[in-house]
């Protein structure tokens, strides 16, 4: 059985790490490089960087910080934001990224997933999915352009249909960003994760809602996710990664040890 992964997420805007609640009202957390170094030293298995306004601004990731990150950390990292072409991806890999993640551009053109997977291999291509639970209908919808709240829109895709579609197109991994839970620290949406797990054959990463160590344990044991991504609990040192890993080991969860 593959070890479960603990993945700090760094949302980047204008060269700084920021964090919002339900993808809104972002506050500045700090500079990218020191935070990335801290997480690598604390035992993170990998890092994810989202240039959150790249897609809505119509640009690609600011590459200046990607190269700096690659120079100072020795764990894998994934970069996302406005990647629309093979050339965009090539530049990020050349600067040192281990994986790239696409989200809004894949919704605009699902063939992008296939083209990237064919060129770089499925193991390097992650698809991020921003889901929203609509209480009135009881349906999970996929949202687009969530980095800019003035441009965020609900697509015609229901969540499970899009999960199936991206796998057929060649996604090597899926990060499920559960927008209703984002930043609230009330726990991951286990019901939603279980639904997605039922149709997801590739590694599934939970994102949105971690507030306590038990939330990670529940996602791994109950929803059988492959990794758990979190931001504010790590940024604000509510949870320390080493302590989290020790706790998970005591819960009989296989974790990568240092």
From Swiss-Prot:
Main location group: cytoplasm
Subcellular location: Cytoplasm
Enzyme Commission designation: 4.3.2.10
Family membership noted in the UniProt record: Belongs to the HisA/HisF family.
Subunit architecture: Heterodimer of HisH and HisF.
Biological role: IGPS catalyzes the conversion of PRFAR and glutamine to IGP, AICAR and glutamate. The HisF subunit catalyzes the cyclization activity that produces IGP and AICAR from PRFAR using the ammonia provided by the HisH subunit.
HAMAP family for the chain: HisF (MF_01013)
Name used for this protein in its record: Imidazole glycerol phosphate synthase subunit HisF
């Amino acid at each position: 059985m593959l070890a479960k992964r603990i993945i700090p997420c760094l949302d980047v805007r204008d060269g700084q790490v920021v964090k919002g609640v339900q993808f809104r009202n972002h506050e500045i957390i700090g500079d990218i490089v020191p935070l990335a170094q801290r997480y690598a030293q604390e035992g993170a298995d990998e890092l994810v960087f989202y240039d959150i306004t790249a897609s809505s601004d119509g640009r690609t990731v600011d590459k200046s910080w990607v190269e700096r990150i690659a120079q100072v950390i020795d764990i894998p990292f994934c970069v996302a934001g406005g990647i629309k072409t093979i050339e965009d991806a090539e530049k990020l890999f050349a600067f040192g990224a281990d994986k790239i993640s696409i989200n809004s551009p894949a919704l605009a053109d699902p063939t992008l997933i296939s083209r990237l997977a064919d060129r770089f291999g499925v193991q390097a291509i992650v698809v991020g999915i921003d889901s929203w639970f609509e209480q009135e209908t009881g349906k999970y919808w996929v949202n687009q352009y969530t980095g800019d709240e003035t441009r965020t829109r609900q697509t015609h895709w229901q969540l499970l249909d899009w999960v199936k579609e991206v796998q057929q197109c060649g996604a090597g991994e899926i990060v499920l960003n559960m927008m209703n839970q984002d930043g609230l620290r009330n726990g991951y949406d286990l019901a939603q994760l279980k639904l997605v797990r039922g149709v997801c054959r590739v590694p599934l990463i939970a994102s949105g809602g971690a507030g306590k160590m038990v939330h990670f344990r529940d996602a791994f044991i109950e929803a059988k996710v492959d990794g758990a991504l979190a931001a504010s609990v790590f940024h604000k040192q509510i949870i320390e990664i080493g302590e989290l890993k020790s706790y998970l080991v005591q819960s009989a969860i296989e974790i990568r040890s240092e």
